[in-house]
């Protein structure tokens, strides 16, 4: 999915978003970056010379007062990076209110987009304690902003890092815009790899069951760290840590 995100930024730079001015022809392009966050996201925007604005993260997601201030008043702000579920490094997930506030924004830039990296959509550690995040595409559509989000996902942290299946979900208008590039960029994707994944998983239930096996390996490691932190540092008021339900 990192490739898809890179392509999306690159396409916006060279050809613009749905008929808007290509970013490379603008004097300034800015991006909101919730911190702490994913370094590979920030590497992409840094590589293209995009000015990055730090947005503090809270337990419910990015500081929405700041996000709304920048998005609604500054037309040079073209996007925001988001990892809505089990966000690194805290493991926090976006609250319902945060998702709704994002979906209801009225950006100053007509080509503003939410870059929604759903990297850990089914990466739960527990069966009985799982975070659930509102469906951003549905919320944007309800708010009258169907084109405002690109939703990315992949099997990189399910099957093969860097060699899985990536996907982008977005509005019909955005998809039509993206396909203009894709039909030039490639004849077709790796259908053998796609078939391999389908035959292995069969359906979403197969994927969920597979992720339970990952959780059985990871859970003891998470719990070991939590137990040591509690035992050695608990009550000393010299540090804080989170206890994520997945990631």
Predicted regions and their residues:
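Hydrophobic "anchor" residues on beta-strands that sit immediately upstream
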Residues: 79, 113-114, 150
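Conserved core of the PLP fold type I
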Residues: 1-110, 121-144
């Amino acid at each position: 999915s990192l490739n898809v995100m890179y392509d999306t930024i690159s396409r916006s730079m060279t050809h613009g978003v749905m008929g808007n001015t290509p970013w490379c022809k603008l004097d300034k392009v800015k991006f909101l970056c919730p911190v702490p966050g994913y370094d590979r996201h920030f590497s992409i925007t840094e590589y293209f010379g995009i000015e990055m604005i730090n947005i503090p993260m809270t337990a419910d997601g990015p500081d929405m007062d700041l996000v709304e201030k920048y998005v609604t008043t500054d037309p040079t702000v073209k996007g925001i990076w988001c990892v809505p579920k089990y966000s690194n490094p805290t493991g926090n997930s976006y609250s319902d209110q945060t998702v709704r506030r994002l979906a209801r924004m009225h950006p100053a830039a007509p080509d503003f987009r939410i870059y929604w990296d759903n990297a850990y959509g089914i990466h739960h550690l527990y069966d009985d304690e799982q975070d659930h995040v509102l469906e951003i595409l549905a919320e944007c559509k309800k708010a009258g902003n169907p084109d405002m989000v690109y939703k990315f996902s992949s099997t990189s942290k399910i099957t093969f890092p860097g060699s899985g299946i990536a996907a982008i979900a977005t509005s019909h208008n955005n998809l039509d815009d993206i396909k203009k590039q894709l039909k030039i960029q490639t004849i077709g994707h790796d259908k053998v790899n796609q078939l391999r994944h389908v035959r292995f998983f069969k359906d979403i239930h197969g994927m969920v069951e597979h992720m339970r096996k990952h959780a059985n390996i990871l859970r003891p490691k998470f719990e070991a760290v939590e137990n040591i932190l509690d035992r050695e540092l608990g009550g000393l008021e010299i540090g804080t840590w989170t206890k994520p339900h997945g990631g």
